[in-house]
Protein backbone atom coordinates (compact mmCIF):
# COMPACT_ATOMS: atom_id res chain seq x y z
CA UNK A 1 0.00 0.00 0.00
CA UNK A 2 1.28 3.47 -0.89
CA UNK A 3 -0.02 6.42 1.09
CA UNK A 4 0.67 10.15 0.82
CA UNK A 5 4.18 10.88 -0.47
CA UNK A 6 5.39 7.35 0.17
CA UNK A 7 6.69 5.98 -3.13
CA UNK A 8 8.70 3.08 -1.73
CA UNK A 9 5.85 0.58 -1.81
CA UNK A 10 6.35 -0.04 1.90
CA UNK A 11 3.16 -0.05 3.95
CA UNK A 12 2.56 2.75 6.47
CA UNK A 13 2.54 0.11 9.20
CA UNK A 14 6.05 -1.04 8.27
CA UNK A 15 7.26 2.56 8.05
CA UNK A 16 5.76 3.13 11.49
CA UNK A 17 7.66 0.18 12.93
CA UNK A 18 10.87 1.20 11.16
CA UNK A 19 11.07 4.94 11.68
CA UNK A 20 9.07 5.80 14.80
CA UNK A 21 10.62 5.19 18.20
CA UNK A 22 8.41 2.67 19.97
CA UNK A 23 7.23 3.29 23.51
CA UNK A 24 6.26 -0.32 24.21
CA UNK A 25 7.56 -3.76 23.28
CA UNK A 26 4.33 -4.69 21.53
CA UNK A 27 2.66 -1.64 19.94
CA UNK A 28 -0.91 -2.02 18.71
CA UNK A 29 0.19 -0.75 15.29
CA UNK A 30 -3.37 -0.10 14.17
CA UNK A 31 -3.40 1.97 11.00
CA UNK A 32 -6.00 4.67 11.65
CA UNK A 33 -7.42 6.46 8.64
CA UNK A 34 -10.02 8.51 10.50
CA UNK A 35 -11.88 8.68 13.80
CA UNK A 36 -15.49 9.54 14.59
CA UNK A 37 -17.22 9.50 17.96
CA UNK A 38 -16.00 6.48 19.92
CA UNK A 39 -14.66 4.62 16.88
CA UNK A 40 -11.37 4.43 15.00
CA UNK A 41 -11.58 3.45 11.33
CA UNK A 42 -8.91 1.62 9.35
CA UNK A 43 -8.07 1.89 5.62
CA UNK A 44 -9.78 -1.41 4.76
CA UNK A 45 -13.10 -0.86 6.48
CA UNK A 46 -11.98 -1.90 9.95
CA UNK A 47 -13.69 -0.30 12.92
CA UNK A 48 -12.45 -0.36 16.50
CA UNK A 49 -14.03 1.09 19.63
CA UNK A 50 -11.50 3.48 21.15
CA UNK A 51 -11.36 2.86 24.89
CA UNK A 52 -8.15 4.90 25.21
CA UNK A 53 -9.66 8.21 24.04
CA UNK A 54 -6.29 9.87 23.70
CA UNK A 55 -5.70 9.19 27.41
CA UNK A 56 -8.53 11.57 28.19
CA UNK A 57 -7.98 14.16 25.45
CA UNK A 58 -10.88 12.85 23.36
CA UNK A 59 -13.34 12.07 26.13
CA UNK A 60 -16.11 13.93 24.28
CA UNK A 61 -15.53 11.74 21.22
CA UNK A 62 -13.39 12.11 18.13
CA UNK A 63 -14.22 15.04 15.87
CA UNK A 64 -16.97 16.34 18.12
CA UNK A 65 -18.77 19.04 16.10
CA UNK A 66 -18.31 21.76 18.73
CA UNK A 67 -14.61 20.98 19.08
CA UNK A 68 -14.11 20.95 15.31
CA UNK A 69 -15.94 24.27 14.95
CA UNK A 70 -13.88 25.89 17.71
CA UNK A 71 -10.64 24.73 16.07
CA UNK A 72 -11.76 26.06 12.68
CA UNK A 73 -12.62 29.44 14.18
CA UNK A 74 -9.22 29.65 15.83
CA UNK A 75 -7.44 28.65 12.60
CA UNK A 76 -9.11 31.58 10.88
CA UNK A 77 -7.69 33.97 13.50
CA UNK A 78 -4.16 32.79 14.33
CA UNK A 79 -2.20 29.72 15.40
CA UNK A 80 0.82 29.75 17.69
CA UNK A 81 1.96 33.16 18.94
CA UNK A 82 3.81 33.02 22.25
CA UNK A 83 3.86 30.64 25.20
CA UNK A 84 5.18 32.99 27.89
CA UNK A 85 2.11 35.14 28.40
CA UNK A 86 3.42 38.21 26.57
CA UNK A 87 0.34 38.58 24.38
CA UNK A 88 -3.31 38.86 25.36
CA UNK A 89 -5.00 35.94 23.59
CA UNK A 90 -8.74 35.77 24.15
CA UNK A 91 -9.17 31.94 24.14
CA UNK A 92 -6.30 31.55 26.59
CA UNK A 93 -7.61 34.28 28.89
CA UNK A 94 -11.13 32.83 28.85
CA UNK A 95 -9.84 29.37 29.73
CA UNK A 96 -7.71 30.78 32.55
CA UNK A 97 -10.74 32.59 33.95
CA UNK A 98 -12.89 29.44 33.77
CA UNK A 99 -10.22 27.39 35.55
CA UNK A 100 -9.78 30.05 38.22
CA UNK A 101 -13.53 30.09 38.85
CA UNK A 102 -13.50 26.36 39.62
CA UNK A 103 -10.92 27.04 42.35
CA UNK A 104 -12.60 30.15 43.77
CA UNK A 105 -13.63 28.38 46.97
CA UNK A 106 -10.09 27.18 47.75
CA UNK A 107 -7.18 29.00 49.31
CA UNK A 108 -3.80 28.02 50.75
CA UNK A 109 -3.20 27.72 54.50
CA UNK A 110 -1.59 31.17 54.26
CA UNK A 111 -4.77 32.65 52.81
CA UNK A 112 -3.58 32.89 49.22
CA UNK A 113 -6.20 32.48 46.51
CA UNK A 114 -5.70 29.95 43.72
CA UNK A 115 -6.60 32.36 40.94
CA UNK A 116 -3.61 32.21 38.59
CA UNK A 117 -2.94 29.76 35.76
CA UNK A 118 0.29 28.69 34.06
CA UNK A 119 -0.37 26.71 30.88
CA UNK A 120 1.92 23.90 29.75
CA UNK A 121 2.05 21.55 26.77
CA UNK A 122 1.74 18.28 28.66
CA UNK A 123 1.18 16.63 32.00
CA UNK A 124 4.91 16.06 32.38
CA UNK A 125 5.60 19.77 31.92
CA UNK A 126 2.89 20.60 34.44
CA UNK A 127 4.56 18.32 36.99
CA UNK A 128 7.98 19.84 36.33
CA UNK A 129 6.53 23.32 36.76
CA UNK A 130 4.77 22.34 39.98
CA UNK A 131 7.98 20.88 41.42
CA UNK A 132 9.93 24.06 40.66
CA UNK A 133 7.17 26.32 41.96
CA UNK A 134 6.86 24.38 45.22
CA UNK A 135 10.60 24.57 45.87
CA UNK A 136 10.80 28.26 45.04
CA UNK A 137 7.73 29.27 47.05
CA UNK A 138 8.51 27.25 50.19
CA UNK A 139 12.31 27.28 50.13
CA UNK A 140 12.17 23.55 50.88
CA UNK A 141 13.53 20.65 48.85
CA UNK A 142 11.64 17.51 49.86
CA UNK A 143 8.95 16.25 47.51
CA UNK A 144 6.59 13.40 48.37
CA UNK A 145 4.85 11.11 45.92
CA UNK A 146 3.11 7.74 46.20
CA UNK A 147 4.39 4.26 45.54
CA UNK A 148 3.32 2.99 42.10
CA UNK A 149 2.55 6.54 40.96
CA UNK A 150 3.29 7.76 37.45
CA UNK A 151 3.68 11.47 36.73
CA UNK A 152 5.68 11.64 33.49
CA UNK A 153 8.88 10.61 31.75
CA UNK A 154 11.23 13.58 32.20
CA UNK A 155 14.04 13.37 34.73
CA UNK A 156 12.18 15.32 37.41
CA UNK A 157 8.77 13.75 36.89
CA UNK A 158 10.35 10.31 36.70
CA UNK A 159 11.93 10.90 40.10
CA UNK A 160 8.40 11.01 41.52
CA UNK A 161 7.45 7.69 39.92
CA UNK A 162 6.72 5.11 42.55
CA UNK A 163 7.69 2.01 40.55
CA UNK A 164 11.30 0.98 40.05
CA UNK A 165 10.42 -0.37 36.60
CA UNK A 166 10.23 3.19 35.27
CA UNK A 167 13.25 4.54 37.15
CA UNK A 168 15.87 1.82 37.09
CA UNK A 169 17.58 2.77 33.82
CA UNK A 170 17.85 6.49 34.54
CA UNK A 171 19.54 6.81 37.89
CA UNK A 172 20.76 8.93 39.58
CA UNK A 173 17.46 10.77 39.82
CA UNK A 174 16.59 13.88 41.86
CA UNK A 175 17.44 13.82 45.57
CA UNK A 176 14.99 14.47 48.43
CA UNK A 177 12.16 12.42 46.95
CA UNK A 178 10.12 10.30 49.38
CA UNK A 179 7.28 7.90 48.70
CA UNK A 180 4.22 7.04 50.76
CA UNK A 181 1.45 4.47 50.32
CA UNK A 182 -1.57 5.80 48.48
CA UNK A 183 -4.76 5.94 50.53
CA UNK A 184 -3.15 5.03 53.88
CA UNK A 185 -3.95 7.61 56.55
CA UNK A 186 -0.97 6.71 58.75
CA UNK A 187 1.41 7.54 55.89
CA UNK A 188 0.41 11.21 56.02
CA UNK A 189 2.53 11.59 59.15
CA UNK A 190 5.57 11.50 56.85
CA UNK A 191 4.60 14.93 55.52
CA UNK A 192 6.67 17.37 57.60
CA UNK A 193 7.88 20.98 57.61
CA UNK A 194 10.69 19.84 55.30
CA UNK A 195 8.14 18.96 52.62
CA UNK A 196 7.77 21.41 49.74
CA UNK A 197 4.87 19.59 48.10
CA UNK A 198 2.94 16.34 47.94
CA UNK A 199 2.29 15.21 44.37
CA UNK A 200 -0.62 12.79 44.21
CA UNK A 201 -3.06 11.29 41.75
CA UNK A 202 -6.62 11.70 43.01
CA UNK A 203 -7.24 8.27 41.50
CA UNK A 204 -4.12 6.22 40.85
CA UNK A 205 -4.08 4.98 37.27
CA UNK A 206 -0.82 3.12 36.61
CA UNK A 207 -1.17 1.37 39.98
CA UNK A 208 -4.50 -0.16 39.02
CA UNK A 209 -7.26 2.44 39.52
CA UNK A 210 -6.95 2.97 43.25
CA UNK A 211 -9.55 5.33 44.73
CA UNK A 212 -8.76 6.85 48.16
CA UNK A 213 -11.30 8.16 50.63
CA UNK A 214 -12.28 11.83 50.63
CA UNK A 215 -10.91 12.07 54.17
CA UNK A 216 -7.47 10.97 52.98
CA UNK A 217 -7.32 13.63 50.28
CA UNK A 218 -8.66 16.33 52.60
Residue ranges and their predicted role:
Residues 1-39, 92:
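Active-site-adjacent loop/helix segments that line or gate small-molecule/cofactor pockets in enzymes
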Residues 36, 51-53, 146-147:
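A secondary-structure boundary/capping signal
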Residues 42:
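Acidic surface patches and DE-rich sequence motifs
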Residues 48, 54-86, 94-118:
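Glycine-rich phosphate-binding segment of PLP-dependent enzymes
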Residues 57-59, 88, 186-187, 205-210:
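Short, small-residue-enriched loops and turns at beta-alpha junctions
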Residues 98-200, 204-206:
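PLP-dependent aspartate aminotransferase-fold enzymes
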Residues 210-218:
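Catalytic PLP-binding core of fold-type I/II PLP enzymes
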